[in-house]
Amino acid sequence: MPRVKGGTVTRKRRKKVLKLAKGYFGSKHTLYKVANQQVMKSGNYAFRDRRQKKRDFRKLWITRINAAARMNGLSYSRLMHGLKLSGIEVNRKMLADLAVNDLTAFNQLADAAKAQLNK
């Protein structure tokens, strides 16, 4: 039985890895072994950071809401509790956007939360 070298399959696999490694620095975009290691590491980073991004944005939104809430004399937690009591269902992303781009609308929401907390 003759030996099968598998040249086209191997070349295709290596070409695919080197294509993914395009733009990497130094030998990481030319040498297959190093490129393969870096592509696998990059995939791990991408997987991890897709989840991390959600946490980072939530932290950013909370920080922005807290800053705007404190300008209205409320803490973040008191503002959120007041909004929940008054039945206003606005998510953190929308609240943070209001805090940055439309402060008057945010102030109205904060006043509604304050009124509900003072009842």
UniProtKB/Swiss-Prot annotation:
InterPro entries per record: Ribosomal_bL20, RIBOSOMAL_L20_CS, Ribosomal_protein_bL20_C
Swiss-Prot/TrEMBL keywords: Ribonucleoprotein, Ribosomal protein, RNA-binding, rRNA-binding
Any single GO BP term: ribosomal large subunit assembly
Keyword Metal-binding: no
Annotated GO MF terms: rRNA binding; structural constituent of ribosome
A cellular-component GO term for this protein: cytosolic large ribosomal subunit
A Pfam family annotated for this UniProt entry: Ribosomal_L20
Cleavable signal peptide: none
Function statement: Binds directly to 23S ribosomal RNA and is necessary for the in vitro assembly process of the 50S ribosomal subunit. It is not involved in the protein synthesizing functions of that subunit.
UniProt similarity note: Belongs to the bacterial ribosomal protein bL20 family.
NCBIfam families tied to this protein: rplT_bact
Oligomeric form and interacting partners: Part of the 50S ribosomal subunit.
Record's protein name: Large ribosomal subunit protein bL20
Gene coding for it: rplT
